[in-house]
Structure formats: structure tokens, C-alpha cells
């Protein structure tokens, strides 16, 4: 998926709309949540991690999902975060697994990112989460200084 860079500019040249449309457009939408979320073995949309934006064909988008603190079950288990299209069972765009190999609770921040294109139109992106076991209290820990983010950025033409 190579980027389609802009042209070189020269002094005195006229900046055209075609050239302007080749620049990145930046943040298309974002979702932020400071509410903790208790994990289950069923993949569901994590609290607050859903957004929509209007995509244009042939443009490159970066989607990022960040959880400041994922707390595992208190036994050996996996915590999974996924970026999906449409809903909790939609097309997987990116996925990450945090494995706790010990019989003790473990914690870690998690970050996923993906570069992709879409057809023109409305696009819904969700961040989902699940765990393999629920022994203890596996959760996504958030508060006013540790908040989850789901972000879509337009990087320019593809």
C-alpha cells in the first residue's frame, strides 16, 4: 500500500486544488473513554470504543486503538483487543493478544494500529475486547488520567 506523495512546489507556482487534495486531512474522528470495563470471554465492544466517519475511496487511513492498562485474569490466560469494522463481529482490521503465562494477575498497556483504505461512504470502527478466562477480575482499567482512545486519521491519497 505505497503512499502517493505530493508534487514538489516551486516559488511563484500556483497551488492547485489537485495538489491540496493530496495533503493528509488529519483526524477524521476519535473516541475517548475514562470508564473502566470488566472483560468477559465474549468479544464485545469496549466501553466508548466506537466511532464513525465518512471515508473517501483511494485514501490511506491510520486507525489506532490504545488501552492504558489491561489487567489479566489471575491465572494463565489471554487478553485480546481487536479493531473491527461495523460491529463486534465485523471484519477484523487488526488484533493483539496479551498473554499472562503465570498464575498471577498481570497488567500492561496495549496499542494497536493499522493502515487501510475503504470504499467511499460511512464507515464505523469499533474496538473490542475479550479474555480467555475470567478468574479474578480481568478488566480494562481507565480513569481521568488513563483513558482509552480510538482514533482514525487520513494520511492522504493511496
Predicted regions and their residues:
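Extracellular "spike/adhesin" assembly and maturation modules
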Residues: 1-28, 47-52
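Disulfide-bonded cysteine-rich modules in secreted/extracellular proteins
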Residues: 27-35
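Terminal beta-strand-rich extracellular "head" domains
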Residues: 34-39, 54-55, 60-158
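Short, polar loop/linker segments at the starts of domains and inter-domain junctions
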Residues: 39-47
